[in-house]
From Swiss-Prot:
PANTHER family: UNCHARACTERIZED PROTEIN YQGE, UPF0301 PROTEIN YQGE. Coiled coil: none annotated. This is UPF0301 protein RHA1_ro03630. Gene3D superfamilies: VC0467-like (3.40.1740.10). It comes from the Bacteria. Belongs to the UPF0301 (AlgH) family. One of its GO terms (cellular component) is cytosol.
Amino acid sequence: MAHAEEPEDRTASTEPVVRPGSLLVSSTDLVEPAFRRTVIYVIEHNDAGSLGVVINRPSETAVHDVLPQWAPLAARPSALYVGGPVKRDAALCLATLRTGAQADGVAGLRRVHGRVVMVDLDSDPEVIAPLVEGVRIFAGYSGWTYGQLDSELQRDDWIVISALASDVVAPARVDVWAQVLRRQPLPLALLATHPIDVERN
C-alpha cells in the first residue's frame, strides 16, 4: 500500500531534536567560507555520532564523468555535489521517491525519512529509475562523533529544521539556505534576508 504524504512533504518547521531528515542550517555567525550559508541533510544520528551531506555545494564535475550509468537519473544540475570534508574520494547518493513509490524490499534502496532514500551506487540504475524522481550524488560527507554536534548546537552554530524531500534535489539556481529559512515562522524567516556578503553592508 502506498504511503501517504508525510507532513514534512508539505511543510517544514524548526525542531529542537536532530534526527534523520533534519536539516542543519548554518547560523549567520558562521562566516568562514567552508560553513557560510551551508545546509546539511542529516542521514544518520545516533549514539555512534551523526552523518549528513551538504546539499547546496555543487562542484564543477559532471556526474557523467565519474558515474556515467547514473547520469540519466541525476537531478539538475547533473553535477557531483561536495557533501563534506570526510572521504571526498567516496560517493554517496540520495534520491527522492516518486509519490506512492515504496523503497521497502527494493535492493539498493534504504529509506532515510519520508520520500528520501539512500541509493547503493552498485545497484542497477534501471531498477531504481521507475521509483525515483531524481538522484543527487555527493563526494564525501559531513560527520560528527558522539556529542560533537550537540556542542555545536549549544553554540548556536546550526539551526535545526525539518527537510522537504525537494530540498535534497533543489536546482543550483535556488538559494537553498535562504529558501529553507524563508518558509519558517517569524522571526526566523527574517534571517533569509541576511546578505551573502556581510561586508557589503
